[in-house]
Amino acid sequence: MRLASFERKGRPGFGIVVGDGVVDMAARFAGKANSLREVLASFGLKELERLAGSAPDFGVDEIAFAPVIPDAAKLLCVGINYMPHIKEMGRERPERPVLFVRFGDSIVGHGQPLLAPRESEQFDYEGELAVVIGKRARRVSRERALDYVAGYSCFNDGSVRDYQRHSPQFTPGKNFHASGAFGPWLVTTDEIPDPRKLQLTTRLNGAVMQHESVGELCFDVPQLIAYCSTFAQLEPGDVIVTGTPGGVGAGRKPPVWMKPGDVVEVEISGIGTLGNPVAAG
């Protein structure tokens, strides 16, 4: 299944994308769940699977995509998790996952503009795989970790590099308003049993900037879930963003920065393409 959050006629909604149509889950869960996160928490994927065969209620062209989980309680992001990216940033391979958080209003949905901040010219792209948790997870083993996943999506961890360097923590450079993107939808695990086989590609104005197998992660998806669940109680709808491969703008000579008028795309095999124009912020 492809599960999406969106706005239609000025109202928030969520549903199942089937071809060029959308099965309206907001209407079917009215009074019982107000978001995809609430459906995952209260009903799980089985109820969505039961409704997946319903006829579409409207077309994809009638919606404006929102972030897949716009109300995620936890948005945990992983830094320096592919060796080529570690090298281009002049870092050493970490002994444990490097984690930081993003705020909900720092991300937008597919097709929505990323805002290049007026405070900096160093606005960089980072194509990444996002993991959406499907059920409560605490102190889970690496061997069982994938049992707790609802599905996967594309993520652009847009980064303002000079602000990222303002402190040892990445928070300022990772949380400018509308600087990152998440979407277009979540693809459930029955369609992606092994995320290591996915291929990730980032394009800027049509030019390939990043291309890597998710199987090259230093800390893979099960390791990340197991590690995060040691200190956090992961809940349905929580998101772990797994890190970016080499090829970021900051690592190029000369550096390449996103600017208003650009279009950036993150494509992951088996999921789809997250595309966003860049506008002045």
What are these regions (language model features)?
Residues 1-97, 265:
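N-terminal non-catalytic cap/leader segment that marks the start of a structured domain
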Residues 133, 140-155:
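RNA pseudouridine synthases
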